[in-house]
């Protein structure tokens, strides 16, 4: 992924590959691009998702029932490109599926299928050297996560970040939250002080009010659970051929309403 040039705060949606079906994931990705997405985070379903709350866990179960795997998720990327998805696609996967595939095989497959970056939530920065080196060799940056911990650790992660830096808004799992920590703006300001790459924030961002509050402190917002919950609500309509376009239009409107403050 080339160095991002950020002229306005980015909208980075997260969806789960294969939820509710692989072919519909492609249409959802295109719909999000139409709604103004700058980068897409494509989640790989996993049976033990430590960083995810109940909404994304349920989506992962639905995708696993569709036989979605890490390899199949990677192979969805060129299918998205064929349908007109032009924005960068970041793969969000837990480490175990990467290990099972083999790190070098994983990067070779990701490169062949034009994945633009990867994010591994359960790989601590201190243990990420091999993955970062493979990422540098293949041009697929490992996106680092940074949480509100010690200033020393924040500085270490921020100064070594590739692609962009993903700030975790609060400790704990993903999910829809009514409120965000009062210290979040200070944390983002601290991270931006040390980072040479764009700084984005995610985990719990689920309303346009929260987006509006954060947009002046970061280079982008990641919205996952709120969108995945909407997909869950539209599940039956999305899978009914004569209702699908209507459901996609509703999803597009919802994504635009959440991110209106960014435009």
Swiss-Prot record:
Pathway where it operates: Amino-acid biosynthesis; L-tryptophan biosynthesis; L-tryptophan from chorismate: step 5/5
Name of the protein described by the UniProt record: Tryptophan synthase alpha chain
Gene3D superfamilies: Aldolase class I
Active site: 41, 52
EC number: 4.2.1.20
Function: The alpha subunit is responsible for the aldol cleavage of indoleglycerol phosphate to indole and glyceraldehyde 3-phosphate.
Reactions mediated catalytically: (1S,2R)-1-C-(indol-3-yl)glycerol 3-phosphate + L-serine = D-glyceraldehyde 3-phosphate + L-tryptophan + H2O
Keyword annotations from UniProtKB, A to Z: Amino-acid biosynthesis, Aromatic amino acid biosynthesis, Lyase, Tryptophan biosynthesis
InterPro entries attached to this UniProt entry: Aldolase_TIM (IPR013785), RibuloseP-bd_barrel (IPR011060), Trp_synthase_alpha_AS (IPR018204), Trp_synthase_suA (IPR002028)
Any one cellular-component term (Gene Ontology): cytosol
Enzyme class: lyase
Assembly and interaction partners: Tetramer of two alpha and two beta chains.
Presence of the UniProt keyword Lyase in the record: yes
């Amino acid at each position: 992924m080339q160095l991002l040039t950020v002229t306005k705060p980015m909208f980075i949606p997260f969806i789960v590959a294969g939820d509710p079906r692989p072919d519909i994931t492609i249409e959802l990705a295109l719909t999000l691009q139409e709604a103004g997405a700058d980068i897409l985070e494509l989640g790989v379903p996993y049976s033990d998702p430590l960083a995810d709350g109940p909404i994304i866990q349920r989506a992962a179960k639905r995708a696993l029932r569709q036989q979605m795997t890490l390899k199949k998720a990677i192979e969805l990327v060129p299918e998205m490109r064929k349908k007109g998805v032009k924005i960068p696609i970041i793969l969000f996967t837990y480490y175990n599926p990467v290990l099972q595939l083999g790190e070098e095989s994983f990067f070779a497959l990701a490169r062949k299928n034009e994945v633009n970056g990867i994010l591994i939530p359960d790989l601590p920065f201190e243990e990420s050297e091999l993955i970062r080196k493979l990422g540098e060799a293949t041009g697929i940056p490992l996106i680092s996560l940074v949480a509100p911990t010690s200033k020393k650790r924040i500085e270490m992660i921020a100064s070594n970040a590739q692609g962009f830096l993903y700030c975790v808004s609060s400790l704990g799992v993903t999910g829809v939250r009514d409120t965000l920590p009062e210290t979040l703006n200070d944390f983002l300001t601290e991270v931006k002080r040390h980072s040479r790459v764009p700084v984005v924030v995610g985990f719990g961002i689920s309303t346009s009010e929260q987006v509006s509050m954060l947009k002046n402190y970061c280079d982008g917002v990641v919205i996952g659970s709120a969108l995945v919950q909407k997909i869950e609500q539209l599940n039956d309509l999305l899978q009914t051929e004569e209702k699908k376009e209507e459901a996609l239009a509703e999803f597009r409107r919802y994504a635009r309403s959440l991110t209106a403050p960014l435009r």
